[in-house]
Amino acid sequence: MSTSPLVIAIDGPSGSGKSSTSRGVANRLGLARLDTGSMYRAVACRVAHLGIDPTTNPRDAIKVAQSCHLEIDTSAIDDRVVIDGEDVTKEIRDPQTSAKVSAVATIQPVRDALTARMRQVAADRGRIVMEGRDITTVVCPDAQVRVLLVADPAIRVARRQAELGEKVDMAQVIDSIVRRDRDDSTVSTFEEPAEGVTVVDSTHLNLDQVIDAVIDLVPVTLR
């Protein structure tokens, strides 16, 4: 197994399979893993807990992003997230939190603050899979492997509903995906591949096939 630095950057819209794919790739190659979306979700939780409305008071939301103590497990197994001493691992996946994320994630200084943290994690870990919306273009544009993971909208909705559980309303899932993609598209161009980014369409692939497709892009000398 290589010890050379390796960053695998995976971008994609909601429900495209980024999390399952990044976890699988990290497991197979023995890499660290960072779900960058969990950083935005954690900040959104903290902002809400402090009673801050980011739409009317973005300045205080920015302060939270810049000064909070954020702990994110980068193992391929655990997704534990702690912000300012509070474990928000479960809360950040709640549909109510999802509805609040865009208001925080679309504030450019918040993105700048968290981007700096993401880059530091990549530098500290050395060999890592990073998933998000703008990893291939903004966070790690020089990553050795850059992937845009896509899937048909119907497939994305079905995957997200399965992830959230049977009790989640389909209309709510569709609204969440459409809203997040629309809002995030105002601050990142994740829907079209940048130069040098490989598109992997997971619509007709199972998870193992998607993982294989990403790993095939990793130079043998870096595996």
Swiss-Prot record:
Gene3D superfamilies per record: P-loop containing nucleotide triphosphate hydrolases
GO molecular function, one term: ATP binding
Record Pfam families: Cytidylate_kin
Residues covered by region (Disordered): 1-23
Keyword ATP-binding in record: yes
EC number: 2.7.4.25
GO biological process: one example: pyrimidine nucleotide metabolic process
Keyword tags: ATP-binding, Cytoplasm, Kinase, Nucleotide-binding, Transferase
Coarse class of the protein's main subcellular location: cytoplasm
Stored InterPro entries: Cytidylate_kin, Cytidylate_kinase_dom, P-loop_NTPase
Residues engaged in binding ATP: 12-20
This protein's GO CC annotations: cytoplasm
CDD domains to which the protein is assigned, alphabetical: CMPK
Reaction(s) catalysed (UniProt annotation): CMP + ATP = CDP + ADP; dCMP + ATP = dCDP + ADP
Keyword ATP-binding attributed: yes
Protein location: Cytoplasm
Family, similarity comment: Belongs to the cytidylate kinase family. Type 1 subfamily.
UniProt protein name: Cytidylate kinase
Gene of this entry: cmk
